[in-house]
């Protein structure tokens, strides 16, 4: 296994772990930055070695270290899924219709994987899509369209079609609220 593959796998699993924190804490209106992870039942504060993505769940046999209550299998599944999508993004071919730099394409792929997994989980668990993720996804998508237009000898039609598609799509979700 190449070192970059291992690095991207670990990065993806770590981002997946953050997605788990995001999904859990945003629904409870808690900070996603401050505060340590705790067992939801006994409030035991997890040590750093209990927070290693994927690995800790298996080492703890899917149970809290203190009270032995089951920890949902969803945690390592989300971490593995995110790691898998990051690896897929790493080895996918860059977009075929532009000379966009490879690093930008990869970075955008990682960000979009994060947004798609987060929104999918929010929708599955709470039937709710947080505006701070959907709106930032919209801005990132439009920024990408603008950059692709610039790298495609500034084909303004491409950017305008992306802008109109974003407007129609976002309007659809606003109407559904």
Feature annotation, model-predicted:
Residues 60-61, 65-135:
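Long, charge-rich boundary regions
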Residues 25-33, 91-98, 124, 150-154:
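Transmembrane helix-loop junctions in multipass membrane proteins, especially transporters and channels
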Residues 19, 23, 85, 89, ...:
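Alpha-helical membrane-inserting segments
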Residues 11-20, 61, 126, 177:
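Functional transmembrane helices that embed catalytic/metal-coordinating motifs
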Residues 1-27:
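Long, highly hydrophobic alpha-helical transmembrane signal-anchor segments
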Residues 19-74:
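Membrane-proximal soluble regions of multi-pass membrane proteins
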Residues 8, 100, 106, 111-177:
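Functional transmembrane core segments of multi-pass inner-membrane proteins
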């Amino acid at each position: 296994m190449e070192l970059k593959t291992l690095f991207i796998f670990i990065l993806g699993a770590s981002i997946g772990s953050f997605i788990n924190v995001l999904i859990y804490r945003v629904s409870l209106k808690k900070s996603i930055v401050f505060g340590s992870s705790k067992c939801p039942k006994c409030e035991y504060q997890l040590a750093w070695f209990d927070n290693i993505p994927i690995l800790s769940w298996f080492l703890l046999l899917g149970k809290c270290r203190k009270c032995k209550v089951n920890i949902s299998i969803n945690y390592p599944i989300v971490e593995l899924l995110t790691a898998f999508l990051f690896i897929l993004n790493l080895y996918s071919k860059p977009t075929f219709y532009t000379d966009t730099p490879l690093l930008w394409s990869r970075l955008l792929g990682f960000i979009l994987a994060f947004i798609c997994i987060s929104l999918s989980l929010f929708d599955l668990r709470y039937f709710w899509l947080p505006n701070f993720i959907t709106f930032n996804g919209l801005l990132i998508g439009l920024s990408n369209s603008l950059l692709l237009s610039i790298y495609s000898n500034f084909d303004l039609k491409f950017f305008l079609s992306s802008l109109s598609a974003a407007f129609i799509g976002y309007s659809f979700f606003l109407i559904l609220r």
